[in-house]
Regions:
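Short beta-strand/loop motif that positions the catalytic acidic residue
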Residues: 35, 178, 183-190
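Alpha/beta-hydrolase active-site loop
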Residues: 2-24
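Alpha-helix capping and helix-loop boundary segments enriched in small/acidic/polar residues
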Residues: 1-6, 36-40, 155, 224-227
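C-terminal catalytic histidine-bearing segment of alpha/beta-hydrolase fold enzymes
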Residues: 79, 160, 165-167, 192, ...
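Short alpha-helix in the alpha/beta-hydrolase fold that links the catalytic acid
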Residues: 48, 180-182, 194-206
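Acidic catalytic loop of the alpha/beta-hydrolase fold
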Residues: 74, 188-194
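Accessory cap/linker subdomain of secreted extracellular hydrolases
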Residues: 68-175
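Primarily recognizes the serine-hydrolase "nucleophile elbow" in alpha/beta-hydrolase
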Residues: 16-88
Length: 244
């Protein structure tokens, strides 16, 4: 979860699998690819786009992608969470922490970030039997009660947290400069994955040299994380149809 390689690899792999299946079914696939996704799917879309540009993906022609409402700047997401008195989806924080614990063998990550009993309880809460809302019911949405006071105060200054900041940087996508068309979307009233994260990511990409003719941004006016889904789908279908 919010790990670049394990997110981007399956995007490319499923395209390869679909291409092989099309040959088996005698379906003519022209190789043109459009990528779209929302929330974590937005991150996956941008990650897949990046990997397709930077790796050999013979047989595929990426026409455009449309990542929506993802947390592309992971350090920015951490700063957003830490700045809030409360956050209504605390299981997201546990999800990222457990992912990085597994990928990086970060044995202290749960106790570094979370207070008890949450640091002990989190692995069992993510055993696959509970929904996100059910996990939330076993956590607190008050950040000062969920998170360790030390990390809230010192994540940017104490070297013990360097491994976290390095992981955030490695897996963030805000320094990617796309050369194939990308249309970003985000709801302006989104407080689940903050709108500003997409704005900052877009501005970073432009500052680093992305062409406004390649990279564009569509604000979904007054849309929350939930209410932005339908207008995004409607617009992206029309946009992709025009690019075919």
């Amino acid at each position: 979860y919010y790990h670049y390689e394990s997110t981007a690899d399956p995007v490319v792999d499923i395209l390869k699998a679909a291409n092989e299946l099309s040959e088996i079914l005698d379906y003519k696939f022209d190789g043109n690819v459009f990528l779209a996704g929302y929330s974590e799917g937005g991150y996956a879309t941008m990650a897949g786009h990046k990997m397709m540009e930077e790796s050999a993906t013979n047989g595929f022609n990426l026409i455009a992608s449309a990542p929506a409402s993802g947390g592309y700047d992971i350090k920015g997401m951490q700063e957003y969470f830490f700045s809030r008195e409360s956050y209504h989806q605390p299981y997201y924080l546990g999800y990222v922490a457990l992912s990085y614990k597994q990928v990086y063998n970060a044995t202290n990550i749960l106790t570094d970030i979370f207070q008890e009993p949450y640091s002990t309880d989190l692995p069992d809460l993510f055993d696959g039997s509970l929904s996100g809302s059910q996990i939330n019911d076993n956590l607190t949405d008050v950040m000062a009660d969920l998170l360790q006071a030390d990390i809230l105060a010192n994540i940017n200054t104490d070297p013990k947290y360097d491994y976290l900041n390095e992981a955030f940087a490695i897996n963030s996508l805000n320094e990617f400069v796309p050369t194939r068309k990308m249309i970003m979307y985000h709801g302006t009233a989104d407080i689940t994955v903050p709108y500003q994260n997409s704005v900052d990511t877009y501005n970073s990409m432009i500052d680093l040299g992305a062409s406004p003719n390649i990279l564009s941004f569509v604000p979904l006016e007054d849309a929350t994380h939930d209410s932005g889904v339908v207008p995004y789908i409607i617009d992206v279908i029309e946009t992709f149809d025009a690019l075919k």
